[in-house]
Regions:
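Structural detector of well-ordered beta-strand residues that form the stable sheet scaffold
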Residues: 103-105, 129, 170, 204, ...
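Catalytic domains of cell-wall/extracellular-matrix polysaccharide-remodeling enzymes
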Residues: 135-240, 244-260, 266, 273, ...
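Active-site beta->alpha N-cap acidic-glycine motif
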Residues: 53-165, 276
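Membrane-targeting and insertion segments and their boundary/processing signals
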Residues: 5-8, 12-15, 121, 125, ...
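Terminal accessory/targeting
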Residues: 1-68, 72-76, 93-102, 207, ...
Length: 283
């Protein structure tokens, strides 16, 4: 009887272990399924955020309605903020492959690699715009002088490196950023735009947003969809994207963005001081 009991116990133990293993396998499969579903929900939520953000930006733009006039030239201005980085180099490679031009609103970096990228941007027919030397909001938006000093410092670096003196810029966060009011007072944004124009420069916001800065890493399809939907029905699309070090999916999205914009009839140009700007309503 002792051996029989041991055998029965062993069978029961094996049965329990098999049951546990089966349960764990099912549990793991459920966890994986929930994880995948959660990722899909995040992407769907981001897409909804894209719609909301595009609507907000549309409301902020001055004279922003898409043109309904047929058969007019359509120009796309791809713009990349917050570089240079290794992503900038990959973006330049893609632009070269597609024979497309872009504008890079750069920040200050005096490494040899960054200087190489400043030079390459200009040498390959693209444009450089100023985006402040430091991109530290609490510093650059303290006052009109602090903002302009950051721009001058960056302008001198770019000019010394490339021989080209930039005359266009983009406010970090856009011209309607609330950080101007938070750090510099209610009148700072207005005084800055007037100062920029007095000095013979132009600033550019955007009317199409790739949404690649809405969270640390936005999926490639969401970026592509945001740009192509935002550009639909326009004759001029100033597209906001980013080439900061973390923006790997922006690089991945770029070929589909270029192909999609070409399919909509766009040709690619660089921003210049006399390009029709997109301006947000000031805070």
């Amino acid at each position: 009887m002792g051996k029989q009991k041991k055998f029965i116990v062993a069978v029961l133990v094996v049965g329990v272990l098999v049951g546990l293993a089966t349960h764990m396998f099912k549990l793991q499969a459920t966890v994986q399924a929930l994880k995948k579903e959660n990722e899909q929900l995040i992407d769907e939520n981001t897409s909804l955020s894209v719609d909301l953000e595009m609507a907000k930006q549309e409301a902020q733009l001055i004279d922003s309605k898409p043109s309904t006039q047929p058969k007019q030239p359509k120009f796309a201005y791809l713009t990349f903020d917050d570089g240079p980085s290794s992503n900038t180099e990959q973006i330049l490679n893609i632009l070269k492959e597609y024979d497309a031009k872009a504008t890079f609103f750069v920040i200050g970096s005096e490494t040899e690699y960054s200087k190489h990228l400043y030079k390459r941007i200009i040498e390959e027919g693209h444009a450089i715009g100023l985006h402040s030397y430091s991109h530290v909001y609490s510093d650059i938006y303290k006052s009109e002088d602090a903002f302009m000093e950051s721009m001058y410092q960056l302008r001198n670096l770019v000019e010394d490196t490339t021989g080209v003196r930039p005359d266009i810029l983009r406010f970090p966060g856009g011209s309607n950023t609330t950080f101007t009011t938070r750090y510099g007072g209610a009148e700072l944004a207005s005084s800055l735009t007037k100062r920029i124009h007095r000095e013979g420069m132009q600033y550019f916001d955007w009317n199409v947003c790739g949404q690649d800065a809405t969270r640390p890493l936005v999926s490639t399809p969401v970026i592509v969809d945001a740009v192509l939907r935002g550009a639909r029905g326009r004759n001029q699309a100033i597209v906001l994207l980013h080439d900061a070090p973390a923006k790997k999916t922006t690089v991945e999205a770029l070929p589909a963005i270029i192909e999609g914009l070409k399919a909509q009839g766009y040709t690619f140009e660089v921003l210049k001081r006399d390009t029709q700007p997109a301006h947000f309503r000031l805070p």
